[in-house]
């Protein structure tokens, strides 16, 4: 999902 791709350990709403 986008969180993994963005390298962000938080929710997609926060990261993306």
Swiss-Prot record:
The keyword Transmembrane does not apply. The cysteine framework is III (CC-C-C-CC). One of its GO terms (cellular component) is extracellular region. It comes from the Eukaryota. Expressed by the venom duct. The keyword Membrane does not apply. Disulfide bonds join 2-16, 3-12, 8-15. It is found in: Secreted. Its main location: secreted. This is Conotoxin ar3e. GO terms for molecular function: toxin activity. Belongs to the conotoxin M superfamily. It comes from Conus araneosus. Keywords: Disulfide bond, Secreted, Toxin.
